[in-house]
């Protein structure tokens, strides 16, 4: 209550912030006549002068802001015919300050972004503008590119399928447009390259994310993964799938739709054991079977075709639950995707092994400065602040919003609801008012389409199956008599322009067929109407059988429905019901926030390790004298081997050290095999003599050879480490049953695995170097196979050229090849 009176007297925090920008706004507006006086040729010269002043330290970037913003506004009016409104200037200042600008749909976010983009481009470090799809990246780069060009700035655009040279050129531009996936995957690929001239990115200075809620929140649960093939067989997936089809619900397993899990009963376990001919599926040796069974159950009873995925060209393709877009190339992890392929009887692809991965949360936190813009962010302000340190600023609209948002209408059954929806569409269609029907799944959009076809109502369907003309369909959705059915993808970023007589008819009507789990997604749908002061209306149609109502509606809501009394086909329109639904949505949002926060806690452990490894990789790649790193590794490795000798000196210990020296360092090349144990200094001298021989053979190629082996061993060990961390992550949740904190255990055990990784890299480097054979070649520089298909060798022009040959090896921490299941160093490696 007290805070309410404080806001009444002093205004909200947002109001106070907006008021504080008035002096800057006045400065920009006062410069309008000065900028108008400049000729077209003087504009780029003026911007170049600002850049020089900044780089010479004569003025700061904040001091330049009013003049740069005024110059951009004038140039935009001349080139694009669009002049920035004051609210867009406010948004631009907020973006420059590293905030999220919430601006209503249709208020001109794309144009607003040009202000901070140009200002920060003066630093010469590259500004990245991140969009949700290739179409918007290409459109915005071409559209705003004309403005940037008039100012003397260059623009690059990233789209899928570009070559490395084209990508490098795009990143070299002052401003680079691209999707979040392209930026993230380029970062991962750069950290798999072998030569500095292969890198495409040039740092992470400033990024502005369009539809920031979609990228930083909706996609936060899906990490970017580059993977390589695995040798594991896929037959188990089809075998288990056949068994699952014969299990009976309730008797053999139970389904928790709310938690999205399926629990196998004792009877179900017996059925599986009989079918597979095993005694106990819960025996530790059958852990893989347990995993396959649970994933198959999930595939059959939690994941729905045309809702969570579609089947296209003999493949299971994921449908993004928030945008309704297809996600080709993405795969569910932990064998779930293979279980879905077995369920749909398409080709089951082999499980892939992770070679590199990062979450969007950790990728975008690498930028020195991050900003975002969207029409709907305020409902997630807490998450933006806690995870990204980003403050949400609500920018007032240029014109008052006059859209009418009607109360929800609720029916008993889905059938009654859909009948009412079709009836409402027919009535609106008769009077010519355009309707945009929003659905949360492909399944629902196709059901309504089928019902409308039976009534001979002409309409367009826009979902993941029919998305080729997305922008065109959405742009036409505001014309007289148009009926458009769209999933959540709904052409975000594309303006719906109202036809000439549509304003008199009441504008575009938004008809929601179901409430989404997130209020923000519902608000996005509503925001398609009533843009820039246009008229419009919206209404959601619900039923007690909708997933949100069924799974998350409270008992209080059910009781309220009974008291209100519902006849068949009769809807209820009640503010208390709408509030109860909103309360259910808040609970789900809170649940999803905790999931994302938990994922980030785990990924932060991996992120620290990734940062260390990628920094090490960068240092190796750019070190003109990589022998310094070799010497450091040698000292560390010899210290590890000889450390126990400092406290004890006995035959068994001597024998163990002797074995390690000959096994890892291959000392038989430079000294006779006997029981004499060299001192640490003698061992170091002997090993360095092997490097001297290598140097004399490799000649000018020596440093390149050192770098290559160091990088290849690092990549090989990192790949194995990622697999080990995946295994640790999968099983760590069980620690909770032992009254231990799974996150703390993951951190501790992850650190132990990381220490082993560093030891493995050191050992692998010396196993390789001490077993290298260089064969002199006429035409080819020392050739090597990349660790994966995503690495491409750089061109070299050198006279002395060699072929590198390596022998197969077993690392001390690898599983012993004898099949015991122990590590090599604890098994055959002891001897």
Curated annotation (Swiss-Prot):
Residues noted as binding Zn(2+) in the record, renumbered to the chain: 816, 818, 827-828
Family matches, as InterPro entries: Helicase_ATP-bd, Helicase_C-like, P-loop_NTPase, SEC_C_motif, SecA, SecA_CS, SecA_DEAD, SecA_motor_DEAD
UniProt xrefs under Gene3D superfamilies: Helical scaffold and wing domains of SecA, P-loop containing nucleotide triphosphate hydrolases, SecA, preprotein cross-linking domain
One GO biological process term: intracellular protein transmembrane transport
PROSITE patterns per record: SECA, SECA_MOTOR_DEAD
Required co-factors: Zn(2+)
Gene Ontology CC annotations of this record: cell envelope Sec protein transport complex; cytosol; plasma membrane
Cofactor note: May bind 1 zinc ion per subunit.
Membrane topology: Peripheral membrane protein
Major localization listed first in the record, in broad terms: membrane
UniProt catalytic activity: ATP + H2O + cellular proteinSide 1 = ADP + phosphate + cellular proteinSide 2
The keyword Cytoplasm is annotated on this UniProt entry: yes
Subcellular location: Cell membrane; Cytoplasm
UniProt KW keywords: ATP-binding, Cell membrane, Cytoplasm, Membrane, Metal-binding, Nucleotide-binding, Protein transport, Translocase, Translocation, Transport, Zinc
UniProt EC number: 7.4.2.8
Entry superkingdom: Bacteria
SMART domains: SecA_DEAD (SM00957), SecA_PP_bind (SM00958)
One Gene Ontology molecular-function label: metal ion binding
UniProt: ATP binding residues: 88, 106-110, 495
UniProt similarity note: Belongs to the SecA family.
PANTHER family cross-referenced by the UniProt entry: CHLOROPLAST PROTEIN-TRANSPORTING ATPASE (PTHR30612:SF0), SECA INNER MEMBRANE COMPONENT OF SEC PROTEIN SECRETION SYSTEM (PTHR30612)
Quaternary structure, from the entry: Monomer and homodimer. Part of the essential Sec protein translocation apparatus which comprises SecA, SecYEG and auxiliary proteins SecDF-YajC and YidC.
Function: Part of the Sec protein translocase complex. Interacts with the SecYEG preprotein conducting channel. Has a central role in coupling the hydrolysis of ATP to the transfer of proteins into and across the cell membrane, serving as an ATP-driven molecular motor driving the stepwise translocation of polypeptide chains across the membrane.
Protein's name according to its UniProt entry: Protein translocase subunit SecA
Organism this protein belongs to: Lawsonia intracellularis (strain PHE/MN1-00)
């Amino acid at each position: 209550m007290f805070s309410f009176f404080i806001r009444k007297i002093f205004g909200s925090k947002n109001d106070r912030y907006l008021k504080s920008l008035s002096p800057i706004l006045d400065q920009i507006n006062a410069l309008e006549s000065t900028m108008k006086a400049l000729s077209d040729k003087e504009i780029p010269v003026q911007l170049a002068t600002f850049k020089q002043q900044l780089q010479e330290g004569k003025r700061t970037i904040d001091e330049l802001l009013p003049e740069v913003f005024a110059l951009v506004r004038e140039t935009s009016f001349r080139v694009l015919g669009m002049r920035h409104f004051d609210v867009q200037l406010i948004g631009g200042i907020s973006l420059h300050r590293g905030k999220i600008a919430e601006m209503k749909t249709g208020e001109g976010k794309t144009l607003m972004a040009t202000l901070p983009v140009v200002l920060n481009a003066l630093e010469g470090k590259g500004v990245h503008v991140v969009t949700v799809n290739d179409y918007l990246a290409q459109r915005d780069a071409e559209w705003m590119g004309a403005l940037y060009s008039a100012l003397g700035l260059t623009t690059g655009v990233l789209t899928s399928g570009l070559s490395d040279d084209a990508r490098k050129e795009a990143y070299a531009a002052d401003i680079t447009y691209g999707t979040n996936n392209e930026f993230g995957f380029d970062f991962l690929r750069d950290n798999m390259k072998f030569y500095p001239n292969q890198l495409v990115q040039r740092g992470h200075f400033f990024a502005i994310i369009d539809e920031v809620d979609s990228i930083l929140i909706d996609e936060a649960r899906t990490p970017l993964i580059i993977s390589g093939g695995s040798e594991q067989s896929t037959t188990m997936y089809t075998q288990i799938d056949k068994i699952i089809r014969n299990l009976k619900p309730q008797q053999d397993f139970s389904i928790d739709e709310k938690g999205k899990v399926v629990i196998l009963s004792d009877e179900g376990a017996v059925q599986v054991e009989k079918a597979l001919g095993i005694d106990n599926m819960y025996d530790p040796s059958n852990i893989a079977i347990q995993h396959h069974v649970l994933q198959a159950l999930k595939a059959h009873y939690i994941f729905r075709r045309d809702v969570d995925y579609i089947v296209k060209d003999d493949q299971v393709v994921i449908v993004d639950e928030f945008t309704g877009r297809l996600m080709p190339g993405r795969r569910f992890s932990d064998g779930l995707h293979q279980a879905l392929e077995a369920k749909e009887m398409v080709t089951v692809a082999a499980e892939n092994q992770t070679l590199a991965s990062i979450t969007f949360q950790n990728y975008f936190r690498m930028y020195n400065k991050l900003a975002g813009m969207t029409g709907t962010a305020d409902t997630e302000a807490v998450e933006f602040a806690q995870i990204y340190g980003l403050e949400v600023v609500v920018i007032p609209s240029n014109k008052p919003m006059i859209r009418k948002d009607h109360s929800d209408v609720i029916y008993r059954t889905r059938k009654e609801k859909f009948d009412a929806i079709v009836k409402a569409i027919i009535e609106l269609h008769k009077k010519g008012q355009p309707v945009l029907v929003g659905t949360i799944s492909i399944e629902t959009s196709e059901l309504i389409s089928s019902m409308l076809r039976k009534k001979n109502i002409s309409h367009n369907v826009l979902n993941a199956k029919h998305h080729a003309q997305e922008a065109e369909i959405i742009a036409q959705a505001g014309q007289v008599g148009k009926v458009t059915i769209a999933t959540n993808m709904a052409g975000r970023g594309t303006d719906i322009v109202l036809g000439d007589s549509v304003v008199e008819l009441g504008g575009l009507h938004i008809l929601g067929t179901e409430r989404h789990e997130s209020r923000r997604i519902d608000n996005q749908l509503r925001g398609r109407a009533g843009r820039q002061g246009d008229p419009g209306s919206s209404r959601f149609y619900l039923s007690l059988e909708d997933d949100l109502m069924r799974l998350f509606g409270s008992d209080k809501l059910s009781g309220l429905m009974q008291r209100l009394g519902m006849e068949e086909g009769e809807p209820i329109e009640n503010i208390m019901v709408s509030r109860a639904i909103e309360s259910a949505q808040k609970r789900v949002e809170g649940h999803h926030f905790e999931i994302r926060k938990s994922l980030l806690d785990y990924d932060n452990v991996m992120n620290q390790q990734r940062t260390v490894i990628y920094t090490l990789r960068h240092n190796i790649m750019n070190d003109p004298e990589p022998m310094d790193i070799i010497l450091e590794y040698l000292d560390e490795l010899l210290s590890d081997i000889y450390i126990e000798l400092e406290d004890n000196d006995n035959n068994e210990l001597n024998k163990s050290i002797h074995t390690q020296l000959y096994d890892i360092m291959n000392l038989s090349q430079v000294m006779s095999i006997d029981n004499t144990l060299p001192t640490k200094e003698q061992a170091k001298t002997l090993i360095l003599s092997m490097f001297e021989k290598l140097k004399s053979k490799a000649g000018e190629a020596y440093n390149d050879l050192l770098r290559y082996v160091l990088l290849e061993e690092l990549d090989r060990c990192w790949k194995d480490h990622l697999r080990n961390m995946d295994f640790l992550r999968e099983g760590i949740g069980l620690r909770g049953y032992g009254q231990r904190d799974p996150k703390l255990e993951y951190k501790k055990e992850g650190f132990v695995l990381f220490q082993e990784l560093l030891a493995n890299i050191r050992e692998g480097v010396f196993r390789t170097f001490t077993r290298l054979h260089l064969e002199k070649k006429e035409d080819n520089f020392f050739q090597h196979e990349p660790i994966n298909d995503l690495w491409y060798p750089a061109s070299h022009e050198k006279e002395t050229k060699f072929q590198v040959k390596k022998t197969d090896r077993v690392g001390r921490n690898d599983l012993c090849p004898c099949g015991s299941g122990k590590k090599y160093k604890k098994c055959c490696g002891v001897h």
